[in-house]
């Protein structure tokens, strides 16, 4: 295949992988390919890296979403890398490695794609892979599941050092087709684009089958009497009655739009013994925190509680949530941390009824709900084969209030004055 086809092949692979929600969460993960082109300045052959840039989703990735970097320069950064304490500085250095105009802005994961010595690399966030990655004995389970075909990399926040860690693990395990990244996801590689994709799917499917065949029957514990899903009509009526109240509470700091989900996955989780302890442990994949916050608000009343009782309890729980969130911020914030972004929950779980999710617009609200469904799947998988053990709260905070993430938020267009507000127009039909 000629080198001109390398980006097209990468886009096609990314779109296929991103189209199946079992492979990665919305806008999660990134892919890359390396290849040789003729440098128009020197007429000499030069090696390039095409890698999904910052933002965007694999399922709809196009060529304009790829960052294009010179591999010789990217690899030379290893010699000036000042160490893990200052690894964030390396992101600015990526701009000095761009080829031509460079395409999309390079993401924090660019180091992993450049430093790991393989022509094609996929980094993904599949529920099955994260389930192993967040199991208390994830390293041993990865060995049991994959033998030496997939290696383990201890949790580390995404960045330059994680790229170096994965590159080293690959060097020490030349037979491996990829790695499980503790607390986070998976990375797979291949000599060709087809091989890389096949390796990604092999890891995702093997992990899912392992959980299926080795997992215990009721990972979330027994159904708690009274917390079963209400019949659909009753459930929807209660959701409709609660929706404006929940949205009002979730909009205390800033106007939010809401989304409601009462899928079987959600209702089943809400009916089980382990709902509250697991919800309290919070999500783990680095992508999740900015969308769902670390923890949801969980209503602790049975499904049959009246709307009035539930509203009273929601207000109490919301006040407690805000206090707890401010405590979490104060426990971990340093003088360099961005200011607290608001203490309202992004996810509200009501047993018997369903899940409300919130965001600054409709799409963000829906995606927050999708991410929490990912988190439920991850917790179920981890609890099936082991004990769910997400990364430490301090690490979660470091990601939620990461200065690089903050910079990304600041670059996003400011919401329009009426965004997130709902207007009721009456008498307009005359
Ligand atoms: Zn990731």
Q: Where are these predicted regions, by residue range?
A:
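Conserved glycine-rich cofactor-binding loop
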Residues: 429-430
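Glycine-rich flexible loops
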Residues: 1-424
